[in-house]
Regions:
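Beta-strand/loop-rich accessory regions of lumenal/periplasmic or secreted enzymes
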Residues: 1-179
């Protein structure tokens, strides 16, 4: 674990990941020497409209989500380090009082909070848990509010540094899609 002024790094055998405190997520993800990210992942809350959507006016009713998708703003970041199931909170704003990372850290959790560009505003949280094997467990949480229109999509948008030529998708049912 590496504590930086603007970044937080985790590295192990065959991998490294660098989280930007103000970037809203990981800014670098390297496995076996190959960079896997072009930019930090962001919440995805808008999708292309279908013919059915257009027929019932959905794109107009839910247009606020398009702005929220395009202009997602990270408003905070928290870091927790774990060693032998004991939690060690880490203050990302305390540059002066930081102590070096403990050698026995067995996982870290970085959580970013995004605000939506809707009225009323609400929040989306993205948590990344990284273990020593380089596995990253990602969780997204949406805190809905009364009065908001239907949410078109909820997911994580990742921009990769190069086109993917081969992949497999295991969706939950016929209603899910790999984009």
């Amino acid at each position: 674990v590496i504590h930086g002024d603007l970044t937080y790094g985790v590295c192990g055998e065959g991998f490294s990941v660098i989280f930007g405190y103000g970037e809203g997520g990981p800014v670098s993800l390297v496995y076996d020497g190959k960079e896997c990210l072009y930019r930090a992942p962001k919440p995805a809350v808008w999708r292309a409209s279908t013919e059915n959507d257009k027929g019932n006016g959905f794109p107009v009713k839910s247009a606020v989500w398009m702005a929220s998708d395009m202009f997602a703003a990270c408003i905070g970041c928290t870091v927790k380090e774990y060693a032998k199931d004991k939690e060690y909170p880490f203050d990302v704003t305390d540059i002066v009082g930081r102590v070096p990372a403990a050698e026995d850290i067995d996982r870290v959790e970085i959580t970013y909070c995004f605000t939506t560009r809707t009225v009323p505003e609400t929040e989306i949280q993205i948590s990344y848990q990284v273990n020593p094997a380089g596995q990253i467990h990602v969780q997204l949480h949406y805190k809905g509010k009364q009065g908001l229109p239907q949410l078109p999509e909820f997911g994580l948008r990742m921009v990769l540094p190069e086109a993917v030529e081969e992949y497999s998708w295991e969706g939950l049912c016929g209603e899910t899609y790999p984009d």
